[in-house]
Amino acid sequence: MSILDNIEPPLIEKEYGALHPINQTKKYLLQLLSKIGFEEVHGPEIETEEFNFDMLNIKKTHPARQMHDTFYAENKEYVLRTHTSPVQIRSMLESQPPIAFTSAGKVYRKDDDATHLPMFHQVEGIYVDKNVTFANLKDLIHQILHDLFGSDVEIRFRPSYFPFTEPSAEVDILSENGKWLEILGCGIVNPVVLENCHIDPNKYSGLAFGLGVERIAMLKYGVNDIREFYKSNMDFLSQFK
């Protein structure tokens, strides 16, 4: 018998991978919206100005179209999409109400600090049918936020302005330290946007909302700096397995 016969190989602990916390959050949101009845649709990250701005009633003079806010291609006709709304526009052009679409993915803006990145993720939704009202929108937003943060979370709606919705609102939740935190934007779809998609605004109305996935993840997991999600720090990321 060889002395090697009594030697057992060392036990090696297996390390299993897991979804990144941003992908976990995005997946959760999409599953939630799917249960409500939203269909996920997809579109390009490199968009035309027409679909990224014009179809959404964002005028040529709007600040969002300036070079210091948007990443333009060399020929200036294409941009890295600044939101996922163009995906819904493309899908609406191929459909007729009632429709309920959600789109999720990377979007790009010229921001970079503790709460903003030049690339981040959005989940947006749009619902168009007869007699859709702001009351329907409020009910839907409460349903989403109660699922995310618990049934006792305090929610407030503040009047706001977006070119593609009218009326528009920003929605805040009350944090544990007593501060209101902006969580999403929403509104009733502007009739101009419906007309651009060949939908009669005299017959149909719609609601729309958009959430920043990183913002949701920061609040849900108590992360103060958005950049932590992308530093490849395994000690940090292993918390989310």
Over which residues does each language-model region extend?
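TRNA-recognition modules of translation machinery and tRNA-sensing kinases, especially anticodon-binding
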Residues: 1-241
